[in-house]
Amino acid sequence: MEALLILVIVAALLALGYAAFNFIGVKKLDEGTDRMKEIAAAIRVGANAFITYEYKIIAVVVVIIAIAFAAIFTVQYGEFSWEPSVCFMIGVIMSASAGWVGMKIATYANVRVSNTARNTKNIGSTLKVALKGGSVMGLCVGGFALLGLFLVYIIFGFGLNMLDIEALRGAHVFTQCLSCYALGCSIVAMFNRVGGGIYTKAADMGADLVGKTEAHIPEDDPRNPATIADNVGDNVGDVAGLGSDLLESFVGAISSAIILAVSLYLSNVANNLEVSDEMLSKMMYFPLVFAAIGLIASILGIAYVLLKKGSDNPHRDLNISTWSAAGITIIGGFVATYLLFNGENADILKVAGFNIGFISPWIAASLGVVSGVIIGGIAEYYTSYDYKPTQTIAQASKEGAALTITQGLSVGMKSCMYPLIVLGITTYVSYAVSGMFGIAMAAVGMLSFVSATVSVDTYGPISDNAGGIAEMSELEPEVREITDKLDSVGNTTAAIGKGFAIGSASLAALSLMVSFLYAFQPEGSNLDLNFTNPLILAGALVGGALPYLFSGMLIEAVANAARKMVEEVRRQFRDIPGILEGKAKPDCKTCIEISSQGALKEMRMPAIISIIFPVIAGFLFGPYFVGGLLIGATLSAIMLAIFTGNAGGAWDNGKKYIESGAIEGQGKGSPAHDAAVVGDTVGDPLKDTVGPSLDILIKIMSTVSLVAAVMFYNYNLLYLIFGIK
């Protein structure tokens, strides 16, 4: 069975090797004119400076948490326990590495995309450069995630003999190691998403509010001092943040599936049901194998699009990459399921929760794959200007900004229903065919081809940057037309990616919650989270409000940083003679510093709350309160994230619909366009800061709670004072 780990490490190394190959391939391309090189260098320096400062803050937080873990688990196990802390550090390193590499390639690829468009005037060739750059981020997400899991298995599972059946029945250290590895990934994801989101939207709003709305100059105009900061933000928020986010979801889903397999086994043993050590081993390896197959499928899907002849339809090419990866994953997953579980004793399969025989976990995982594609399609319908919802926002803009906002709110709210129906069906059917393990496998299935989806999502900000460089370098209009078309498709893929991220986060959080319940309840007992229990109900009420508090803090953080940016841009327009005539250069460096300082200052409190809140709640009120807290927060956050992501995406593409000339007499600079710009500006922090951060909030809360579940049960204030557990 251990030989299956060879498939995992081979898939990880193939992905990282192909990522390195594409990284080198992109860097070999020419950067273009001296002006293009100058702008690209400024973006690169700004992005490097921000992520360096951010990682220094993360390092301090990580050291504190690692020391705390060592102390907590030493108390819990009665002997010095360093293993969970080391696994936590491995998770931090893997997630930080993926984010750093992704940000690096984005700052190299952007100018090369612009130059390819300038030289070829061909959208197909330009798309390939952007996708090749995006694939580096996508492949690193899958590669580093599986590499870290492989290290945890090899070092702790086999090296320290934690996978021994007696060890699993005893202290459960291996499952704690997996939880801590997932938490390490979560910490980096939270800081990258929150910090990057505040940075990018503060710069974006500052550039738009003064540049477009007041000075009436085009987007990415070189006269606007906030333009460089805006382009830096695309890299630190939409590339590094996105990659860390989905890497964390990927790891969380796999880890929770493995932990659930162990919990189900121990529960069956406690109930004297017929169980098999070999069956446990197969269930512990199956999530890893399925994820490895998905990673290989993603490599094939990306390679096919990069190697085939380019077309003038970028949306179709990107869909081919994603759908082919999904299809190969389903087929390969069936083969793996057949080889692992076919021939297993029917009674043992039934005890494990496999209600439709050996094929049960494959059905659950495949359902996750399909539901991910469907949720992405729903997001596309509500955010692409090819469809009615976004077109109605553009039409409403003819009557002013108030109706733009109102119509966008309507679209965002209505867009919540169908993804939740899909998630509800997926959750129930997965449970029906394969029990709690099936829900975890649905999350693994949805994320199995994550490298393909992240590659497509990262292509968007790279194309957006390329358009900015083309505009600031004053390249011919045909170049901007190509980059604008790629950017428009990128906005839709970004909305699809956000829907995919929150969908996968909800399934991952649900399986982590189940693992949390197993962690502190007596082995063999039925899982019980009864809402007639006032502790659970109180926790759910508080949890339902928490995403709104968190979102409000993020929006306020963006507003505070954007206000400083607006003041600086206005000052430069007022005090630097000739800047609006193009005779003087703006001071872009000051704007970059404002965004960096604002993001680094404002990100701390939301990030800390997401980690500390469940800990304080657990030690005050115990694990049942925390269980309610997690359910309330998850349900609330899912709906809020879908609403903010789709409303913001629809406002953005509604503006682009007007810019495309689709509404007669209402192009750039028209009253309808001015109203649409207001909608786009309002939607920016919603879709790029709030929405993406909410899915990390529910995952990090679930992971922190899982790690500390036993401590909550044994050492909470209610128990110490009143004896209530």
Question: Predicted regions: what is each one?
Answer:
Residues 1-725:
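Hydrophobic packing and interface segments
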